[in-house]
Amino acid sequence: YVKVGELIGTRHGGFFDQPIHSTVSGYVVGFEKKVHSSGQTVDCLIVKNDKKYVLHESCVSRTDEEIAALTKDDYINIIKDSGLSGLGGSGFPTYIKLQTKHPIDVVVGNGVECEPNLISDYKLILERSHRIIEGLTYAMRATGAKKGIIAVKKKYPELFEVLENARHSFTEFDIEIKRVGNHYPQGWELDTIKHATGIEVPVGKLPAEYGVTVFNVATLYGFYRAVKRRMPITERFVTISGNGIK
């Protein structure tokens, strides 16, 4: 029997390992070959969902005192053990970004969805704005950045408002909510950096070389879950659209 958040395997990559956690509770009923989103056929552990979603015993919230005592290495290990990867589409392990040797001055939260029909981050910001800001503060602590920025489109004043209200709960941090353009591809990392910070990162260069690191707002929410609640990535907001929906 496995529980939500329980470690059930490890993905061994060419340059890094990623833990895999159960997203449901239930009994293991076997192994099967399945086609991964990458197109590769991989081994899968099959867990029969009992719909109870029983949390694993390890998923216990940290106190504010415990979080205040965390070091940079602690943050890296927490994020690594949570399996958190870029939720803006890259799927790149988040802990790798935290291991940069470059000094980071500013963390940018990307809340700009520029592909047609996508509104999952929009919905996440509306419903989890406080947690996103809290996740941003953890990312700032993990990188040593003194400045945090969350970028959203100008055409969504409601997103600016909820984030601005949430920001006031974290007055000890220098956090700014920036309204950027509505054009495509505003959500592209380098374009977001340019319009949110004024820093131009040349194509082919890493943002960290210019003192910037960027995380999607869903990834920042993942920071909150991992650091505060000791929860790995077991769920996310998704967009379903099209004429076939009934």
Question: Whereabouts are the PLM-identified features?
Answer:
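Acidic low-complexity segments
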Residues: 30, 35-87, 92, 101, ...
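Conserved hydrophobic positions within beta-strands
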Residues: 26-28
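Hydrophobic alpha-helical positions that pack around
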Residues: 146-246
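Histidine-anchored nucleotide/phosphate-binding helix
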Residues: 126-142
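Gly-rich Lys/Arg/Thr-decorated short loops/hinges at beta-loop-alpha junctions or inter-strand turns
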Residues: 55-56, 107-121
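Short, well-structured beta-strand-loop connectors
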Residues: 1-10, 30
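Short, Lys/Arg- and Gly-enriched loop/turn segments at beta-strand edges
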Residues: 11-23, 37-41, 55-57
